[in-house]
Amino acid sequence: MPRSLKKGPFIDLHLLKKVEKAVESGDKKPLRTWSRRSTIFPNMIGLTIAVHNGRQHVPVFVSDEMVGHKLGEFAPTRTYRGHAADKKAKKK
């Protein structure tokens, strides 16, 4: 369910300050964040944000198609290793 329009998009203040500082200085170094719940804003376009997935920080380069989505959508938390092989079929 989407967030109410009267509330507006959510972004953590500490992340917003980091983004504004990086845009102001023109720094291209990745911004490390644990805030997966923050919405991607238009002023983040062109920045690389390292989003934590529970184990490591995944670098996410923000493009214009990502605006309005959450940062956590681009840093998967689960790794799929496939289903277990059938032991009977393997034996023959």
UniProtKB/Swiss-Prot annotation:
InterPro entries: Ribosomal_uS19, Ribosomal_uS19_bac-type, Ribosomal_uS19_CS, Ribosomal_uS19_SF. The lineage of its organism: Bacteria, Pseudomonadati, Pseudomonadota, Gammaproteobacteria, Enterobacterales. Keywords: Ribonucleoprotein, Ribosomal protein, RNA-binding, rRNA-binding. Belongs to the universal ribosomal protein uS19 family. GO terms for molecular function: rRNA binding; structural constituent of ribosome. The gene is rpsS. Pfam families: Ribosomal_S19. Protein S19 forms a complex with S13 that binds strongly to the 16S ribosomal RNA. GO terms for cellular component: cytoplasm; small ribosomal subunit. GO terms for biological process: ribosomal small subunit assembly; translation. Disulfide bonds: none annotated. This is Small ribosomal subunit protein uS19. HAMAP family: Ribosomal_uS19 (MF_00531).
